[in-house]
């Protein structure tokens, strides 16, 4: 029986990465992830299969700027609308991408550590989370081709030089099916020469390489 959060996390990572990560590296990885999440290794894991919502819950899904009111920050306007007009009728608020972005209505993230200034601040996000259960689109599968991490990939610098999936010419993509007309692999100029990067959605959305433990920790 898994009694601690660290044990459960270790089990999940071992199931995904198998022999690709040594036991010692796996233990260090678990510690890094728990520290990053500010969680205790001895903390009990959440109950399995516990529903976080039921038929009585009502969720609002919205972009950060779906509601505008003069010069007020859109996230403040959203909070005011929810608390004054909807109140306790709503239990969940799902905010679509609110980070700085370059394309695809927020789904090509430039910087995960900040809130788009055109929408508001982290305080506005926190305020929503105080009054409602908060959900957000973190967009963890890819980031903007103009992000600092991808610029570092091009320059061969850290962090970022090994954050992106860059298959070689022998990689078989013949079984990949995707509802897109843009190329799956895009060639980019780097310090090491031209390299192909995996772009599931668009050339501006470059996929992360989660085979690299550093990406998961980041």
Locate the predicted segments by residue.
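Acidic/aromatic-lined carbohydrate-recognition and catalytic surfaces
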Residues: 2-217
